[in-house]
Amino acid sequence: MEPVISPTLDSKQSWSIFILDHEESLASPRKLNIPNPENVYSENRRYFADQDFRRPRHKPDQNMVEYWVPPEKTSVAKNNTTGQAVTPGQAKKLNQVCPASAPNGKRAMKIPKVKEPRGENSSKKSSADQAPGPFRVMYWKVGQYFEKASGTVNHHYQKVVLFRNRMKANKVAPIHTKVQSRHLELEPLCCLSSCLVRGGCTTVVVFELCYVVATALCIFEAMFRKKFALWEPFPKSFNGWFAHPLFYYTIAVYDVALFVIAIATARALVNFDKAVLHIHYIFCIFSFFINFFFLIFSIWSLVSPGSLTFTPINCLLIFCFLYQLPLNIWGFFVVKSCRDFFALIHVFVSLAEA
């Protein structure tokens, strides 16, 4: 390779030897020297100077900082907010706010106040650094307790609603919604063919409720006629058993059972429920024997020697026992006929659905 000697522009008049990269020597190859960036800049500083000279000057410098310019000067002197006169050549302070009626319609920029962060050694403490008071702690605890309780109640309420919805979904339509007028035309007669069986059962229910009211009044009058006592010793004479609390408790239990049966029968007559009528049909048999026992016991105890006699209240109680006997016999047949009619209606409805 042939070296090329070229003079440089440096004042020291040093010579730089450049090795041609595109020419290779077959005899003795040499490695190329990597140029140093400092040497390249020193050798070509005129080139870089020309580049700086050619830089466009219309672009603003990146390091330039723009400051706020005060409002334009006015020829009229006005007072500022502090009451001092402002001359036309005097500029306003940066933190001074221009009045709203400025000629240029602008407001001066107000320097915002930056809140410095508090240090650990700061004497001022905020409310966040202070421990909450006992009343606030109690308020929080009570609020958490009520929130937890309301969540539990709401959870159980949702369970109840879900169970009710399931029961409604699985509920079968009642029989009284399926009864047609053609079914009621087959209703038999009772009471010597004077009324229908449902009317006869309604009459039985009314007489049974009257029996409950009359016997309850007799029991209250007999027990409160003297000092009320829940229990008394057994009397020595048979006559005293008529006024003993045990006899009144027995009548009261029978009245409660009769009242429940009467109300259930009245509801069954509307809903065409044959099961309740079957229970009332069986209850008429026991009711007959119970009233027969009450009647014999009352007459026998009052006839026996003693202080108790046939007073109006005692006679009313005996009359209730007496008239209940034929009522039970009549109700037995009327309720049986109504039960059979309801069973026939159930058969007709089942055939219609099939």
UniProtKB/Swiss-Prot annotation:
Domain of life: Eukaryota
Region (Disordered): 96-130
Biased composition annotated in UniProt, kind: Basic and acidic residues: 113-127
This protein's name: Uncharacterized protein C45G9.11
